[in-house]
Design a protein with these regions (language model features):
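Bacterial Sec-type N-terminal signal peptides, specifically the leucine/valine-rich hydrophobic h-region
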Residues: 8-11, 142
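Long, intrinsically disordered, low-complexity segments
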Residues: 14-16, 44, 71, 102-103, ...
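Short coil/turn linking the two alpha-helices of tandem helical-hairpin repeats
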Residues: 146-147, 151-153, 196, 215-224, ...
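Flexible, polar/acidic helix-loop-strand segments at domain edges
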Residues: 330-485
């Protein structure tokens, strides 16, 4: 019975309808509290399967932006995620999971909301708290749907046989914000419980208020100012609570940035407004993707350190915080430049957020081939590195020891990577070629050789983990048990700052943004704060946290290619304003009678 029910509830409908011929079963199930909460649990199914922390959601929310390029700046792979298809015909099926996931999730939420009067809760507070879970999740599904796809079909009631259609219509984003997203988040912020710092996956009041502020601010993208005051008000509720002890909403911001992503603070992270983690153990697991496909974010950001001979990818190292899985996200020159302060020093968040040194995990001796490839002097041949020794070091011009390290780049027994070897400040991009100092054989000084150093770059460590369930050691199948933070308190200050610019000309914006900067140990911003200042600050604070694609849309940076030409010119050459929306999966559009009309422009 349960397996049949779960299959029915998670049915992928090719008509955007959640029609289930066994709907009476759900009505019967909803007449008991346990049964109804089974329906509530089903609302989470698509979220945990496809969204925050799941495979490629990071790419949909952070890729194709100014902050990231594909590993080593290669433009022949993952083109839909990082290169706006790189000038080729767009892939129109890669969004299939999220398109189906939206309507699986919305369908489950609609069922739970519609049947909310059935279970015998003793108080309306208990009943509404459960309904609020479904309404919060429905808002999040629709929020992501409209920001990824634009106008989508708006469904707010369970679909019955009589309403099935193979010619669906699309509803514009603002209408969905007005009629579903914002009302659902208002309801959720009123009725969800406060929870504790240990509350995970289940949303709380602070999650609802945070997403209400986020959603209201996002409507500015559509030329609306109607909800900006509500965005600011919701943000201020959380800020006031945070600065007075968190007594009402349980909000908190760590005194130092370094505490936010400490693994010891992960499961009960106080700053996270909403977080999710998976369970896996010998007694079972809670992931529909399998017991080793849990939080996948730890797999995405590490540079290819295994390309150097003192490193290797092995099971033992995979279980350490340092890790060994080569990722797909490389920071752009623009992202790294954001951490250079006006006085020439580095924002402390750079070295907190990015790993720039790696130790050897095997014994290694430099041979002639490696010495020549990495532009070392002949004297380095035969030098040895022992396991645990410094193996790779990336240096920034602003580092205190930069000049000293720079002098050793050709003679050090570790691989020394100079920022200027990898990135070009003149061209705002990655150097694909390199001019050798120690010329030998095919390694020349005319800049025609492939740049081997571009494989090594600062690697975001916000999602690093040493907390794994080992599902199969021989196959290196390890499930990351750490939570992913979907939204945290620092973002609320930046939402308030941006809303204040739109509403009040930024009179209070500096106060909000400098709270975040002061906590990080960065120099305070002075003078008038602009939207670009906010966008830059969001890059520093929130890179790799599911925000950037939506940030660029909201602030108008996808209206034309000008912004990308100045921040990520390699990406700008492939940009078209149509690509601010993803393609609706042609797996779906092929099943309806108005597929061409339903599809987004440019696909």
């Amino acid at each position: 019975f349960c397996s049949v029910l779960l299959s029915a509830l998670s049915l992928h409908s090719c008509t955007l309808d959640e029609y289930n011929p066994g709907a009476f079963t759900k009505e019967a199930l909803a007449t008991s509290i346990d049964g109804y909460e089974t329906l509530i649990n089903q609302c989470y199914f698509a979220m945990e399967r496809f969204y925050y922390g799941a495979a490629d959601w990071m790419s949909l929310t952070e890729g194709d932006t100014d902050l990231w390029t594909y590993k080593a700046n290669e433009s022949t792979s993952y083109t839909q995620w990082f290169w706006f298809f790189a000038g080729t015909s767009p892939n129109t099926t890669y969004t299939n999971n999220w398109w189906n996931g939206t309507y699986d999730g919305v369908g489950a939420c609609n069922e739970a909301i519609a049947l909310g009067d059935k279970p015998p809760y003793t108080t309306e507070e208990e009943r509404n708290a459960k309904i609020a879970e479904a309404r919060f999740l429905r808002a999040v599904y629709y929020f992501n749907a409209v920001e990824q796809f634009g106008a989508v079909t708006m469904l707010t009631e369970p679909v019955v046989t009589e309403t099935l259609t193979y010619s669906p219509t699309r509803t514009d984003p603002m209408t969905i914000y007005q009629e579903v997203i914002i009302p659902d988040l208002r309801f959720a912020s009123e009725w969800l419980p406060t929870g504790t710092h240990a509350t995970t996956t289940t949303p709380t009041k602070k999650a609802a208020l945070g997403f209400l502020a986020k959603a209201c601010l996002q409507t500015y993208e559509y030329g609306s100012t109607e909800y900006l005051q509500e965005a600011l008000d919701a943000a201020k509720k959380l800020i006031t609570d945070c600065e007075t002890g968190g007594g009402k909403y349980n909000t908190y911001m760590y005194p130092s940035y370094s505490e936010v992503f400490k693994e010891s603070n992960n499961w009960e992270n106080k700053e996270a407004l909403w977080k999710h983690r998976w369970y896996a153990g010998a007694d079972g697991h809670g992931s529909s993707n399998g017991n080793y496909k849990l939080n996948r974010n730890d797999e995405y950001f590490l540079c290819n350190i295994n390309k150097f001979g003192a490193r290797e990818d092995n099971q033992e190292t995979r279980l350490t915080w340092e890790g060994s899985i080569t990722g797909i996200f490389m920071p752009t020159q623009h992202l790294l430049s954001l951490y250079v302060q006006k006085d020439g020093t580095l924002d402390p968040r750079f070295h907190e957020s990015f790993t720039t040194e790696w130790n050897a995990n095997k014994n290694y001796t430099w041979d002639e081939s490696a010495v020549h490839m990495y532009d070392k002097e002949e004297a380095v041949i035969g030098k040895a590195l022992n396991e645990g020794d410094l193996a790779i070091k990336f240096i920034m011009p602003q580092d205190m020891d930069y000049a000293t390290e720079k002098q050793k780049e050709h003679i050090s027994d570790y691989l020394l990577i100079d920022y200027h070897h990898v990135y070009s400040d003149d061209n705002n991009n990655v150097n694909m070629n390199y001019a050798y100092t120690n010329v030998t054989g095919n390694y020349k000084n005319d800049g025609t050789n492939e740049n081997q150093f571009r494989h090594y770059y600062p690697s975001l460590n916000k999602h690093n983990s040493s907390n794994y369930y080992v599902a199969n050691a021989s196959k290196q199948r390890n499930g990351n048990l750490n939570a992913t933070f979907i939204m945290r308190m620092a973002e609320v200050y930046l939402i308030a700052a941006e809303a204040d610019i739109y509403l009040n000309g930024g009179a209070n914006a500096a106060g909000y943004i400098n709270k975040v900067r002061e906590r990080a140990g960065a120099n305070p911003l002075t003078g008038s704060i602009t939207v670009r200042d906010i966008l830059d600050e969001r890059g520093r604070e929130l890179c790799g946290e599911y925000c950037r694609f939506y940030d660029l849309k909201r602030t108008g940076m996808f209206k034309n290619s000008e912004y990308l030409e100045n921040t990520h010119p390699d990406l700008a050459r492939f940009f078209h304003p149509n690509y601010a929306l993803r393609p609706i999966s042609t797996t779906f559009t092929a099943t309806i009678t108005n597929g061409s009309e339903y599809q987004n422009p440019g696909y």
